Amino acid sequence: WNAGAYSDTSPIVAKNGAITCFGPYRLSHAWADSYAIYTNLPPAGSYRGPAVLDVTWAGESQIDIIADEMGLDPIQFRLKNVLVDGDVYVTGETMHDLHYKTLLETTVKGIGWNTSVDRENSNRTGRGIAVAIKSTTTPSTSKAEIRLESDGCCTLLVSTVELGQGSKI
C-alpha cells in the first residue's frame, strides 16, 4: 500500500487489506502479507473502508475468472462458497448474522441477472456483481438499551455511531 511520506492511516489500510482480501468466502487455507510502503507522494488519508474496495475488486475479479475456467455461473459459485452463520473466517472469528446468500439472491432477481443486456439500444456492454466483507476495529457485537426515565420519557442507548452506514435513528 502506498503510504505516502508519512504513516498516518497506512497501518490501518495495510491491516484492512490483509483481513478483507479473502472476501466473504469459506476458505480452509489462506495467507496474506500486507505492507504500507513509504513513498515521496502525499500521505494516504482516511475514508470509509480503506483498502476494502481495492482488494474486493481484485478478489471478485478472480472469482469471476475461476468460475469461468470451471464452467460455472459466477453467482452459483459465490452462493456455494459464501460465508454463512457459524462459519469461521480466516481470522479465526466465528461469523454471526450473515445474509450473503439472501443478498445475492435478491440482487440477482432485482437486476435481472438472467436476462440478456440490450447492447444495441444501450451503452451497457455487460454487467457484473461483487460481494465484499468489511473489517472493523470495534467488537462485532452491539447492544441497544431503552431506559424509561422518571418523567415518562424513553432514552435509547445504542453502541454504534452514525458515519454514513445507516445506523441513524
Describe each PLM feature range.
Residues 43-111:
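N-terminal leader/propeptide and maturation segments of large enzyme subunits in energy/redox metabolism
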Residues 82-153:
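Helix-loop-helix junctions that connect adjacent transmembrane helices in secondary transporters/permeases
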Residues 1-53, 121-169:
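Gly/Pro-rich active-site capping loops and adjacent beta-alpha segments
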